[in-house]
């Protein structure tokens, strides 16, 4: 029996990885990798601290701050900072664990980490957010650096928060260095960074469509959840490529298209303005072509869809919703969010892939499908190191290459280690898990983090 406290989110992430490794031929071919999994599942370092700040009424407020520095075998710790009242150590360990293998799939030199605080930015003034960010960085700056740990944004941390934190770091450390990514373009940021996760997701699924013989996005109906950066830019790219976007959502409910036309660019621009003001989609003035469904996720309300892209948060597609998507004719599911599908939902998709073969749904995990965001963070780090800026076209081209490599790496690894029947699509979840794990495990072995008996 474990002596650790219950960590349901982390345990789910670990089980999902371990299950796919066990159900492949990896451990038969390389039994020594079992040791690597045991070692890799424990963070190299966990930093927990209090954040004391002053609200607009002069009252003392305190929050819990965290940084999970999970694995540095491939490079400096890399992963976002999340500000949300739900933040706890289990959630950050799950996100950091996923981040290790996601970063490995980009092909860039980045380790895995995650951090944040149980601070709720909603309803806070700009001055309160600034004071919190400065107080948070007063402790965090001791543990990060351009060659040590390079955080980025996540839920609740956008360009404004990155700016406040970077300024606090620069003053405390007396250094101007690429210690955070997602920076403003005039002070070390990269073009395409806000768009990167959404664009990368669409590029990745484009390879799924092409490989399976489903053609292009033209005429495809796509259900999206979420309404933050990932969903916004995925939706814009999908529309640009000829798809019909039929839904967006937030924690209050879902916005669903009622007709054939779908959500428009103008609708998405309006959603962007609402989210920039930190408001809910309940503020959206939807016309006759859209309807608002209070308290619901979109999956059971979108009608016929070809593609589903969860882009909101973890565990947002349940077993029942997975079955509903199959019934609605969905053929492709890819996670724009981290661990967007429950283990039961993944099982529904994977069983369908095995049973229906070429007619099946094809599922891609977040660690592969949404790695575009951290990939462009890595490109921002490279630009900072060289003291230069690449053009939008250069960054976008590099992003396309990274997503293509992530897709084929997972695909070909699945063909190597996972037995498949004739006509069966390769398991992208197994292939991506194995590819990321093997790269990290080998680097850890080479550096003496684990070893085999002679």
From Swiss-Prot:
Native organism taxonomy: Eukaryota, Fungi, Dikarya, Ascomycota, Pezizomycotina
Major enzyme class: oxidoreductase
Entry EC no(s): 1.4.1.4
Active site, renumbered: 114
UniProt-listed NCBIfam families: PRK09414.1
Catalyzed reaction equations: L-glutamate + NADP(+) + H2O = 2-oxoglutarate + NH4(+) + NADPH + H(+)
Keywords carried by this UniProt record: Acetylation, NADP, Oxidoreductase
Domain of life of the source: Eukaryota
Stated name of the protein: NADP-specific glutamate dehydrogenase
Modified residues (N-acetylserine): 2
Family to which this protein belongs: Belongs to the Glu/Leu/Phe/Val dehydrogenases family.
Binding partners and assembly: Homohexamer.
GO BP: any one term: glutamate biosynthetic process
Gene Ontology CC terms: cytosol
InterPro entries: Aminoacid_DH-like_N_sf, Glu/Leu/Phe/Val/Trp_DH, Glu/Leu/Phe/Val/Trp_DH_C, Glu/Leu/Phe/Val/Trp_DH_dimer, Glu/Leu/Phe/Val_DH_AS, Glu_DH, Glu_Leu_Phe_Val_DH, NAD(P)-bd_dom_sf
UniProt GO molecular function: glutamate dehydrogenase (NADP+) activity
UniProt cross-references to SUPFAM superfamilies, sorted A to Z: Aminoacid dehydrogenase-like, N-terminal domain, NAD(P)-binding Rossmann-fold domains
Keyword Oxidoreductase applies: yes
């Amino acid at each position: 029996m474990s002596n650790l406290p219950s960590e349901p989110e982390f345990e789910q992430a670990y089980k999902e990885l371990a299950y796919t490794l066990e159900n492949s031929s990896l451990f038969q071919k390389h039994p020594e990798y079992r040791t690597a999994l045991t070692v890799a599942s424990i963070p190299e370092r966990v930093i927990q601290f209090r954040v004391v700040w002053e609200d607009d009424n002069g009252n003392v407020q305190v929050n819990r701050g965290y940084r999970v520095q999970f694995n540095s075998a491939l490079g400096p710790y890399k992963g976002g900072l999340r500000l949300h009242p739900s933040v706890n150590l289990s959630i950050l360990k799950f996100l950091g664990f996923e981040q290790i293998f996601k970063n490995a799939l980009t092909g860039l030199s980045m380790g895995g980490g995650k951090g944040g605080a149980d601070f709720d930015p909603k309803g806070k003034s700009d001055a309160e957010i600034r004071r919190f960010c400065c107080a948070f960085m007063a402790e965090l700056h001791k543990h990060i650096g351009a060659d040590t740990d390079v955080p980025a944004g996540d839920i609740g941390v956008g360009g404004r928060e990155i700016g406040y934190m970077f300024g606090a770091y620069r003053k405390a450390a007396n250094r101007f260095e690429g210690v955070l990514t997602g920076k403003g373009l005039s002070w070390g940021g990269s073009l395409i960074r806000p768009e990167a996760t959404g664009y990368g997701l669409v590029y990745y699924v484009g390879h799924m469509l092409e490989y399976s013989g489903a053609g292009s996005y033209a005429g495809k109906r796509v259900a999206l959840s979420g309404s933050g950066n990932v969903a916004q830019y995925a939706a814009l790219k999908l529309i640009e490529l000829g798809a019909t976007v039929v839904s967006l959502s937030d924690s209050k409910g879902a916005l669903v298209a009622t007709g054939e036309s779908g959500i428009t660019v103008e609708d998405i621009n309006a959603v962007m303005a609402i989210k920039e003001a930190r408001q809910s989609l309940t503020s959206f003035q939807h016309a006759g072509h859209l309807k608002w469904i209070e308290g619901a996720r979109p999956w059971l309300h979108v009608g016929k869809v070809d593609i589903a892209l969860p882009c909101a948060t973890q565990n947002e597609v349940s077993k029942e919703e997975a079955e509903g998507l199959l019934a609605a004719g969905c053929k492709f599911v890819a996670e724009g969010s981290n661990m967007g599908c429950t283990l039961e939902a993944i099982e529904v998709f994977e069983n369908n892939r095995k049973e229906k073969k070429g007619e099946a749904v094809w599922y891609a995990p977040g660690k592969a499908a949404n790695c575009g965001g951290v990939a462009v963070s890595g490109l921002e780090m490279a630009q900072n190191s060289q003291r230069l800026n690449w053009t939008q076209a250069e960054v976008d081209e590099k992003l396309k290459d990274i997503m293509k490599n992530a897709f084929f790496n997972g695909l070909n690894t699945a063909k190597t280690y996972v037995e498949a029947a004739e006509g069966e699509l390769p398991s992208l979840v197994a292939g991506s898990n194995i590819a990321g794990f093997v790269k990290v495990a080998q680097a850890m072995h080479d550096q003496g983090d684990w070893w085999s008996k002679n």
